[in-house]
């Protein structure tokens, strides 16, 4: 194990990802238009450290308009590349594709940006935070081609 990785496990982004591990029951809100919640549901999530703490595997199950939604994300901090990276698949948004997202800043909040759709492509930003009461908040934002960012999904 490299010294850089050991340090990250003790006090860096890998440490933060380790803190997120657990089984959770939460609440998900979905916005289909700015400022208007289009659906709310209960969800169940499992976040677990895998491969010696190198990655965080996120599995979730919920519903949208009373239809089952399930998904998987892998969150990582790539020390050699100096990037935060995420691979995300689900039964609602991604169809049969994987959304890859990244951020070249590994020293702050876990926040990554990916893109989807045909030209002009839209952005999809995912942020993971832990509040002072140790609640995990995963928020996803749609970013229109012009750069306007709107909350799309939030799970607490």
Regions found by a protein language model. Give the residues of each.
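Short, solvent-exposed loop/hinge segments that bridge or flank secondary-structure elements
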Residues: 25-56
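Short glycine/serine/proline-enriched coil/turn segments at secondary-structure junctions
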Residues: 35-36, 64-67, 93, 118-120, ...
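Residue-level recognition of beta-strand termini and adjacent short loop/turns
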Residues: 51-52, 132-134
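Short beta-strand segments that buttress and anchor functional surface loops
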Residues: 58-63, 86-89, 111-117, 139-142
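Helix-adjacent hinge/juxtasegments
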Residues: 62-100
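Asp-box/WD-like beta-propeller blade repeats and closely related beta-sheet repeat scaffolds
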Residues: 108-116, 120-127
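Edge beta-strand at a domain terminus
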Residues: 141-156
């Amino acid at each position: 194990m490299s010294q850089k990785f050991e340090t990250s496990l003790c006090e860096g982004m890998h440490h933060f990802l380790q803190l997120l591990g657990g089984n959770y029951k939460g609440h998900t809100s979905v916005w289909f238009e700015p400022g208007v919640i289009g659906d709310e549901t209960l969800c169940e999530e499992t976040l677990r450290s895998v491969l010696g703490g190198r990655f965080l595997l996120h599995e979730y199950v919920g519903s949208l308009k009373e239809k089952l939604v399930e998904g998987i994300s892998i969150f990582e901090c790539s020390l050699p590349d100096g990037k935060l990276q995420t691979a995300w698949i689900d039964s609602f948004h991604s169809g049969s594709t994987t959304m890859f997202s990244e951020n070249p800043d590994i020293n702050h909040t876990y926040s990554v940006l990916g893109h989807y759709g045909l030209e002009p492509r839209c952005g999809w930003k995912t942020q993971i935070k832990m509040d002072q009461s140790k609640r995990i908040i995963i928020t996803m934002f749609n970013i229109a081609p012009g750069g306007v960012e709107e909350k799309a999904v939030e799970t607490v």
